[in-house]
């Protein structure tokens, strides 16, 4: 039986979250070279605790996909909801978000063409969540 593990945002997305104000208490961090590292058993840290002393140890906190999605929902009224879609070859997940202020659904790519869906479809739900989080941070916040 496979072990279920937490899915963390990528190093690039974690840096974007820090830049955009994500400051929750987290026990996982990214080192300056991009490796994921767990803090001591009961320790946690916030991005705002980053200073001259800690910069030698870590670059930014490493939230799970769910924490990042919840932060976007609570702080920015953006609900991430990838859709399962059928493509020419198989099934996959389409990045998608809902603007809760307008109650309007959006696909993150303006030029999206359903006839060429394979170009935008992610193989896994987690990759679709990551792609949508990154898009929202880069274009909406």
Predicted regions and their residues:
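Glycine-rich anion-binding surface patch
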Residues: 1-141
């Amino acid at each position: 039986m496979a072990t279920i593990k937490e899915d963390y945002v990528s190093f690039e997305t974690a840096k974007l979250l820090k830049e955009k104000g994500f400051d929750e208490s987290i026990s996982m961090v990214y080192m300056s070279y991009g490796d994921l590292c767990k803090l001591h058993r009961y320790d946690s840290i916030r991005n705002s605790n980053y200073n001259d002393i800690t910069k030698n140890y870590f670059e930014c906190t490493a939230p799970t996909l769910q924490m990042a999605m919840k932060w976007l929902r609570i702080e920015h009224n953006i609900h991430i909801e990838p859709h399962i879609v059928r493509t020419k070859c198989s099934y996959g997940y389409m990045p998608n978000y809902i603007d809760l202020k307008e109650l309007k659904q959006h696909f993150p790519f303006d030029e999206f063409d359903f006839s060429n869906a394979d170009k935008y479809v992610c193989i896994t739900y987690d990759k679709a969540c990551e792609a949508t989080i990154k898009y929202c941070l880069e274009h909406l916040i």
